[in-house]
Structures are given as C-alpha cells and as structure tokens.
C-alpha cells in the first residue's frame, strides 16, 4: 500500500521548492509529480500529425517520494502510518492520528 497517492495534498520538505504545497498528479514508483512544484522548461518540437506547435513548454518533473509529506488539518507536514480497521488497511497521519481519506 502506497502511503502517498494521487490526489493527496502534500508539502515539499527539501530542495529548491521546500515549503511549497500542491496536489499529487501522479505516483511513479518511488517518485511523485506534484502540481506546480519542480517545474522545468522543456523544448518541444512541432508535430503536424498531432497538431501541436513547437516551443518552450513548462513540464512538472517528479520528486522523490521521501522529499514530500502529507499535510494534516493544521497545515503541518505529517508522516503516514498504516493501521488495520474493520479488516481493512487504512492510512493514518502520525501527527493527529486522523484517518486519511482513500
């Protein structure tokens, strides 16, 4: 079970974007793509088959999953634990003990 999933609100703990918040767009193995964080400029070629124009495009680059943490209700970063409730495994915030919505 992944502790961080698509759609989770996270905060960046380290790096040039430290302190920024965003929503997880994708989980790629041990990396996550966070909306508006770690944005790089990529040069795109025009493709007439797809109808795309060329130019410089902003692209969200993935961060390592250990460099982000879920945000609790108080707006603080929190680690995530796994707990069994009613025979199901649920994610629990370590700071508040609240269950994270699936």
From Swiss-Prot:
Annotated PROSITE patterns: RIBOSOMAL_L24 (PS01108)
InterPro entries noted in UniProt: KOW, Rib_uL2_dom2, Ribosomal_uL24, Ribosomal_uL24_CS, Ribosomal_uL24_KOW, Translation_prot_SH3-like_sf
GO cellular component: ribonucleoprotein complex; ribosome
One term of GO molecular function: rRNA binding
PANTHER family recorded: MITOCHONDRIAL RIBOSOMAL PROTEIN L24
Similarity comment: family membership: Belongs to the universal ribosomal protein uL24 family.
Biological role stated in the UniProt entry: One of two assembly initiator proteins, it binds directly to the 5'-end of the 23S rRNA, where it nucleates assembly of the 50S subunit.
Quaternary assembly: Part of the 50S ribosomal subunit.
Designated name of the protein: Large ribosomal subunit protein uL24
Lineage: Bacteria, Pseudomonadati, Pseudomonadota, Betaproteobacteria, Burkholderiales
Gene transcribed to yield this protein: rplX
């Amino acid at each position: 079970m992944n502790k961080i999933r698509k759609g989770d609100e996270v905060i960046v703990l380290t790096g040039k974007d430290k302190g920024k918040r965003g929503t997880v767009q994708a989980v790629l193995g041990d990396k996550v793509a966070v909306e508006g964080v770690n944005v790089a400029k990529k040069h795109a070629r025009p493709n007439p088959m797809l109808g795309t124009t060329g130019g410089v495009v902003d692209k969200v680059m993935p961060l390592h999953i250990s460099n982000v943490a879920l945000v609790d209700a108080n707006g603080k970063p929190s680690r995530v634990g796994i707990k069994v409730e009613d025979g199901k495994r649920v994610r629990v915030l370590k700071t508040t003990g609240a269950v994270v919505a699936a």
